[in-house]
Curated annotation (Swiss-Prot):
Belongs to the paxM FAD-dependent monooxygenase family. GO terms for molecular function: FAD binding; monooxygenase activity. This is FAD-dependent monooxygenase notI. Its cofactor is FAD.
């Protein structure tokens, strides 16, 4: 490998061209990891810019193991610079009584970074651009295709040719049916989420709304309010430069044209709404997003018939937000694929994609189930009977301590055996017992 001016090793070309559709966390991670492994990367994203609505996102230890290799550690340093500066995580009931206060030291958190979703995407995208990768923003892919020796996409009537295609276009994936052969089917859960993020200047001059800034002091704060069938989170980010809130409801409610009005209606019977409502009502109209929560049974297969197209991230395995792993598992997906392609080389790209599926399938299915359990816990809090009906381990080792790169090296041959000979195997990264 050669060393570039920044001191980062430049990978030797593998001869493999990877086309990536979708530049959310999964697509960005796949693009960066594929470049790190020496593959040529061509990216397409339908949105013209990287900004996304949303709230906070946590990058956990299992994903940090991948990110720490990017840019000779520069990407991790950026995450550290923009993470929430928290001392405690506070839990309240619907009357506003503090029920739990857990210490949280952002500088000593175990390989975990909590930050704005849009900031995370921008950090990833800027790093990808710095690598000189071919990126096309604001471009809609019209079609996907493959032969025995190549795969590609059709854009503006032109066929773009590669060795494989990664479909990472999210939960409402347009490419998933063509790759998996399964119909576009999502199951709406019994819930809806509202998310908002806006500049703190929107509330700073309102004494009834700016209490969250006073509570944060010189740092940030994160407060969660639990009621029957409803959970509300509010807080600040980037040293209270930004305010966020999110609301999860057990039922699929009919949203008003303004999602803010819907949330105000949901919490109107909470005694603590006298504090929350002034803050929520200050949300700029275009800064609130309402989302029906979706999941779906695991796809029967992630890889196309000829083995040259694969769905990854939410396109393959959407998680409920309660799992706290959507972006993290997408990052793992991208890293595993890139390494599998490096191991097989250009001569056996289909094997690399199928091994990726084998190594990832059991793990993400287990995490999907954990998300369902976490949802049930958070939306069924009964403070009169002890609060949470079931205690979930906050940072289980099988989830947060998993090393997806190490797993590839240790289990590639076993996964290849499962692919080529049809043998059944259990792979790492799942709960034991």
């Amino acid at each position: 490998m050669a060393i570039d001016g920044s001191g980062v090793a430049t990978p030797a070309p593998s001869g493999i061209t990877v086309i990536i559709v979708g530049l959310g966390p999964t697509g960005l991670a796949a693009a960066i990891e594929c470049h790190r492994r020496g593959h040529k990367v061509i990216c397409f994203e339908k949105n013209p810019k990287s900004y996304r609505l949303g709230d906070l996102i946590s990058v956990t230890g299992n994903a940090v193991r991948v990110l720490q290799e990017w840019g000779n550690g520069s990407v991790i340093k950026e995450l550290q610079a923009f993470q929430c500066n928290l001392d405690t995580l506070e839990v309240y009931n619907e009357t506003g009584d503090l029920k739990l206060s857990a210490p949280y030291n952002a500088t000593q958190a175990k390989d975990e970074y909590m930050l704005r979703r849009s900031r995370l995407l921008d950090i990833f995208l800027q790093h990808l651009k710095s690598l000189g990768v071919e990126i096309h923003l604001g471009i809609q892919v019209a079609d996907y295709w493959e032969t025995e020796s190549s795969a590609g996409v059709t854009v503006g009537g032109e066929k773009i040719v590669g060795d494989c295609v990664v479909v990472a276009d999210g939960v409402h994936s347009k490419g998933r049916p063509q790759v998996s052969g399964e119909p576009f089917a999502l199951e709406a859960t019994d819930g809806i989420a509202f998310r908002a993020f806006f500049n703190a200047s929107e509330i700073s001059q309102d004494p009834e709304a700016s209490w969250i800034l006073r509570d944060a002091g010189e740092k940030d704060c994160f407060k969660t309010f639990y009621g029957k069938g409803l959970v509300m989170m509010v807080g600040t980010a980037e040293n209270h430069e930004y305010v966020f809130w999110s609301c999860g409801h057990k039922e699929n409610v009919m949203a008003h044209p303004s999602s803010v009005a819907t949330v105000l209606d949901l919490i109107r019977d909470w005694p603590v709404s006298t504090r929350l409502a002034p803050l929520i009502s200050k949300t700029p109209g275009d800064n609130c997003l309402n989302q029906t929560l979706y999941t779906r049974p695991p796809l029967k297969k992630w890889v196309s018939s000829n083995g040259r197209m694969i769905v990854l991230g939410d396109a393959a395995h959407p998680f409920l937000p309660h799992a706290g792993q959507g972006a993290n598992q997408g990052i793992e997906d991208g890293a595993v694929l890139a390494l599998c392609l490096e191991i097989t080389s250009k001569k056996d790209v289909p094997l690399a994609l199928r091994v990726t599926e084998k190594l990832r399938y059991q793990r993400v299915a287990a995490i999907q189930q954990r998300g369902v359990e976490a949802r049930d816990q958070s939306l069924n809090v009964d403070w009169g009977n002890g609060g949470f009906s079931k205690k979930l381990t906050l940072h289980p080792a099988w989830l947060h301590d998993h090393d997806c790169i190490k797993q590839v090296y240790e289990e590639f041959d076993k996964a290849a055996d499962a692919v080529t000979k049809g043998h059944e195997h259990t792979f790492g990264g799942i709960p034991v017992g």
